[in-house]
Amino acid sequence: MIRIEHIKKKFKKVIALEDISASFEKGQVISLIGPNGSGKTTLIKSILGMVKPGSGKIFFNNEPINGDPSYRARIGYMPQIGRYPDNMKVGQLFTMLKNIRNVPANQTDEELIERFRLKEIFGKPMRTLSGGTRQKVSAALAFLFDPEVLILDEPTAGLDPLSSEILKEKILQEKSRNKLILITSHILSDLDELTTHIMYLHEGRLEFFKQIEELREETGELKLGKAIARIMKGEKFSSGWIDKMFILEGPSGEVKQENKVY
């Protein structure tokens, strides 16, 4: 469905993506993981046409995306930080996008609007919303037009536990409908029950792209965080690399620390 061929991208002297090739198909949930600055967001924005690669090609349903933005209507995108007009009310935002897309009401997916109880804040300006509430708005917008492909950048960041579970349930529901879903997250426990494939980037390079079951079999670990830590042993990373890279959870699920690599 989406095919990437030898994508390269530099920002001045910084290599963001170095010769990335991969294919993503319907029914897959691809988890893009790696340290900060590894190229995850650049890859996502390249697929969306928001960043133009220096070289290489990207195909959507076997058609090159260059010069034809129409394919984007078939993708639901949830950015890590949603940016919306400050003075626009929440309800106006949804109405505006429905009018732009001209999609009949019976063809929209408003489940997250209902489950997040967003109609209760339709009269509030976007500037008054907390970070977590803005995340709920972004999530509801990503799913609103029942897209074939979902691209979710740190989707549970800033969400309370209940809202996080609601969103994960929705992702699983769309997975069961054979949609292609790409997710980035530093909270690996969020990905255990969702993902089918792991795509690991480091310094703009693709280190591995594996089915999660293959990864578990190779490492003997059921938990994604532990599996990745094992498979990376013997590489150039330090022994504390996995701790530095990801949010760790204690035995009862509480967040212990968050150290990021830049």
Where are these regions (language model features)?
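The feature captures the beta-strand-to-loop junction immediately N-terminal to the Walker
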Residues: 33-35
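Conserved ABC transporter NBD signature motif
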Residues: 56-71
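Conserved ABC ATPase "signature" region
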Residues: 95, 106-121
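Catalytic Walker B motif of ABC-type/P-loop ATPase nucleotide-binding domains
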Residues: 150-154
